[in-house]
């Protein structure tokens, strides 16, 4: 068995080499370069086709032999989505990876490298990096240096360009994978010895945060489910990038609660000229799908919480807030609201935007 595996690996390695050098190969080439009979070479070709290691590029015709190409064992990309939102001179970059391990690796090294980034955190396979426009000189390489880091963030028209400096494995991601991610407009790389730098171009989008509450009744509906349905609905548009769906607990002493008194929050990035239409569509969708007439929606555009947001969120977690107070807070801070009593909790959801999961779910944690 070991001998068969060694032979297989040797033949497959040759096939990959010929594919890289010539674009394809024939059975005769494999037979000649390995010294095995042509019939044996054909058997190996058939076997490796069945294993999906190689594919038939063109069938034989007349005196022209069939030609084959080897498929790499490496995935085309682990970078699912890369996009960015902009608010003044602040930027948040989002990188959704198919591997939690790779996302953790990038978070660790990007955070160590610092640069223009002020905050680097991971939410599952989504890496969120916040920073300001600017550039720094940062070394990458073997430990104890970080292997990869963001060294520059700048804007050119409607594009955000963040420059990544990398060494080793991350260089492969930069040169071979990132350009395939949804949201990437272009990747321009350059190499200097063992260091690879790349400019990653994405569109400058707007961050939209929507809070929802009181969309259900004791016997029908669930606010968390309707919030997620809205995020899915918006995500089907080409101009929207879904980011997150969260649940936050509020003061349990509210008599009108349907259960434990929670509200929901969704985040997404959208093209700036579509935001107004998205807001109108979202309000219409919630109004039509809510089981309760007291539904409420609150919408904030931008990266940052308005002043006094955490104070409002803290009140909603510890006491009753009147609808008049909620309306005054929304008006003073440019937050759109619509609906009935639910705007109180919807505003609380927006006010708690940016808190970690444990804080969102435990009202006893001080803000």
Task: Indicate where each model-derived feature is located.
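A short, conserved structural fragment
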Residues: 49-60
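Minor-groove-contacting beta-hairpin "wing" of winged helix-turn-helix DNA-binding domains
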Residues: 60-71
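Short alpha-helical segments that sit at the start of domains
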Residues: 1-15, 37
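Long alpha-helical, hydrophobic tracts
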Residues: 29, 168-294
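Short amphipathic alpha-helical interaction segments
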Residues: 6, 35-50
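Positively charged, polyanion-binding regions of nucleic-acid-associated proteins
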Residues: 10-20, 207-209
């Amino acid at each position: 068995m070991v001998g068969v595996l060694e032979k297989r690996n040797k033949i497959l390695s040759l096939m990959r080499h010929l594919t890289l050098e010539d674009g394809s190969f024939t059975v005769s080439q494999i037979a000649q370069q390995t010294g095995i009979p042509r019939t044996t070479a054909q058997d190996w070709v058939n076997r490796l086709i069945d294993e999906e290691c190689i594919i038939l590029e063109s069938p034989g015709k007349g005196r022209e032999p069939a030609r084959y190409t080897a498929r790499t064992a490496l995935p085309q990309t682990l970078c699912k989505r890369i996009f960015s939102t902009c608010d003044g001179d602040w930027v948040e970059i989002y990188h959704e990876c198919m591997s939690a391990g790779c996302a953790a690796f990038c978070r660790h090294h990007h955070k160590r490298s610092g640069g223009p980034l002020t905050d680097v955190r991971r939410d599952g396979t989504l890496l969120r990096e916040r920073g300001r426009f600017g550039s720094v000189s940062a070394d990458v390489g073997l430990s104890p240096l970080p292997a990869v880091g963001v060294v520059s963030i700048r804007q050119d028209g409607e594009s955000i360009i963040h420059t990544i400096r990398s060494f080793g494995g991350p260089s492969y991601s930069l040169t071979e994978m990132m350009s395939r991610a949804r949201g990437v407009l272009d990747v321009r790389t350059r190499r200097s010895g063992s260091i690879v730098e790349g400019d990653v171009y994405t569109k400058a989008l707007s961050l939209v945060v929507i809070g929802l509450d009181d969309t259900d009744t004791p016997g029908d509906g669930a606010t968390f489910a309707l919030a997620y349905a809205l995020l899915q609905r918006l995500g089907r548009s080409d101009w929207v990038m879904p980011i997150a769906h969260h649940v936050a607990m509020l003061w349990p002493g509210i008599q009108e609660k349907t259960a434990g008194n929670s509200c929901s929050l969704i985040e997404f990035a959208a093209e700036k000229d579509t935001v107004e239409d998205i807001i109108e569509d979202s309000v219409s969708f919630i109004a039509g799908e809510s089981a309760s007439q007291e539904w409420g929606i609150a919408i904030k555009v931008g990266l940052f919480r308005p002043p006094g947001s955490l104070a409002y969120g803290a009140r909603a977690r510890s006491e009753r807030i009147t609808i008049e107070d909620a309306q005054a807070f929304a008006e003073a801070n440019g937050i759109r609201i619509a609906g009935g009593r639910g705007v109180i909790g919807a505003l609380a959801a927006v006010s708690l935007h940016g808190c970690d999961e444990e804080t969102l779910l435990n009202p006893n944690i001080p803000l």
